[in-house]
Amino acid sequence: MTGQNIRIRLKAFDHRILDASTREIVSTAKRTGASVRGPVPLPTRIEKFTVNRSPHVDKKSREQFEMRTHKRLLDIVDPTPQTVDALMKLDLAAGVDVEIKL
């Protein structure tokens, strides 16, 4: 896999789980002999929802909720076959969404 990069994009609602998963991927890649660029923190997506507090009246009384999606980007430069195998066998936290592009 010479001259090829692996781009890994991670998404999660909890930044602590996301950072732990990022550290795990970086240590696995470095242990197998690949060099890593990143992690690059991408902009956090904030979705806000505004709802009425009461079911019937009082339009002025509202409540706001927000959902934050944290993102990180990793580039693994010149991965070895051992790196690819180790990344496939890696078990990450349940709340982390992983997108891999070759």
UniProtKB/Swiss-Prot annotation:
Please list the GO biological process terms of this entry.
translation
Instruction: Note the Gene3D superfamilies from the entry.
Output: Ribosomal protein S10 domain
**GO MF terms, alphabetically ordered:** structural constituent of ribosome; tRNA binding
**Annotated Gene Ontology cellular component terms:** ribonucleoprotein complex; ribosome
- Is Transferase tagged as a keyword? no
Query: SUPFAM superfamilies under this entry?
Result: Ribosomal protein S10
User: Which PANTHER family does the entry mention?
Assistant: 30S RIBOSOMAL PROTEIN S10 FAMILY MEMBER
The similarity annotation says: Belongs to the universal ribosomal protein uS10 family.
- Output the HAMAP family linked to this UniProt entry: Ribosomal_uS10
What does the record give as the function of this protein?
Answer: Involved in the binding of tRNA to the ribosomes.
Cite the record's note on assembly.
Answer: Part of the 30S ribosomal subunit.
Protein name, as recorded? Small ribosomal subunit protein uS10
UniProt source species: Agrobacterium fabrum (strain C58 / ATCC 33970) (Agrobacterium tumefaciens (strain C58))
Q: Which gene encodes it?
A: rpsJ
